[in-house]
Design a protein with these regions (language model features):
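A membrane-topology feature that recognizes alpha-helical transmembrane segments
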Residues: 1-329
Length: 329
């Protein structure tokens, strides 16, 4: 079997794993609004194995293997946390293993810089042949900034759910590049994990329009203030709020003249209230003689990303398509 055939089998295996894994994750996230770390720990094993096989097929270079260790150590902190001095003193073998992996990874990165980056002409890295050890090492190294971007987006709440961030980190390991997979249609421009995120994000563009039509049909537009709410929220009976995955946007506040009034927030709270705190807010609204309130649903991003896996298989990178229709690709 030739190299191209081996990579093709590897690529399609990755895509099958991606679809099956995300189908299960989307189901769990939709039902529970939570995907336990144990789920990702099971699936990431297959992703790591396939990555090792890719390196073995393309370069079998010890520097690249070591650099991959740095990527895995950095990504593992999303599942097991960052090792601390206190944990190491307690003799936690998991934390010590991560530290060892970091050491191996730093060793690989150091020798990669020494061997593969000409200091007198750094721009030479842009012209490495795709089948060279240098190119494979550089592709492996570039997964680290991709993971950093995902983690920062998570911390800054650009990616709201932990399961969503861990899913994207999983994709970064499962499909670090497009080398092993050629989409049925279209071409590629950005890394696979970002292409998948864009495909999933397209579903959110249709969400405001859907909510506007839903609120108009339910006659939820009764004042000018309601117009500011209909594109991202819906009204729900107070009795149903605690049994649904929603954020309550209405709140009773005391106005400057000492009178209680209902204020609708345009954003969900930064920290989800406890059930007791939510019940107090609902009771305050009942005392204002209201029967329903504005809420925004906790839409699971994974439910939107999952269809994106199919779109990515058949249409590749959405950014490339945008550039194509703009006449730039």
């Amino acid at each position: 079997m030739g190299l191209d055939a081996s990579l093709a089998i590897l690529g399609w295996t990755r895509m099958v794993i991606l679809v099956v894994c995300f189908a299960g994750a989307a189901h769990l996230d939709n039902k529970q609004r939570k995907v336990h770390n144990s789920y990702w720990k099971v699936w990431v094993k297959s992703a790591v194995l396939l990555w090792v096989l890719e390196i073995a097929i393309r370069s079998d270079d010890w520097i690249t293997y070591c650099t991959m260790a740095a990527v895995l150590a950095y990504g593992s902190t999303a599942l097991i946390g960052t090792p601390t001095i206190a944990d190491l003193k307690k003799g936690s073998w998991v934390d010590w293993a991560v530290v060892v992996w970091y050491g191996i990874g730093m060793y690989g990165i150091y020798w990669g810089v020494v061997e593969y980056i000409p200091l007198n002409d750094v721009t030479a890295v842009l012209s490495y042949p795709t089948n060279s050890n240098e190119y494979m090492w550089l592709q492996t190294l570039m997964v680290i900034p991709i993971m950093f971007f995902i983690k920062m987006a998570w911390k800054l709440r650009l990616i709201h759910g932990g399961a969503d961030a861990k899913a994207l980190l999983f994709v970064a390991v499962l499909i670090p590049s497009w080398v092993t997979f050629v989409p049925v249609n279209g071409d590629t421009f950005v890394p696979p994990v970002f292409a998948l995120l864009v495909w999933g994000g397209l579903g959110f563009f249709l969400l405001p329009l859907s909510l506007i039509l839903h609120n108009i049909a339910d006659n939820n537009v009764k004042s000018f203030d309601d117009i500011t709410m209909i594109w991202h929220a819906t009204r729900m009976p107070l009795d149903e709020i605690t049994d649904n995955f929603v954020w309550l946007l209405d709140e009773v506040v005391i106005s400057p003249d000492g009178e209680p009034t209902i204020v609708s927030s345009l954003q969900p709270p930064k920290k989800s209230p406890t059930r007791e705190e939510l019940m107090i807010k609902i009771e305050e609204l009942r005392l204002m003689d209201v029967e329903d309130a504005w809420v925004t649903k906790k839409y699971p991003l994974l439910s939107y990303i999952f269809p994106g896996t199919i779109l990515m298989i058949f249409f590749g990178d959405p950014i490339w398509w945008i550039l194509y229709f703009a006449g730039l690709a």
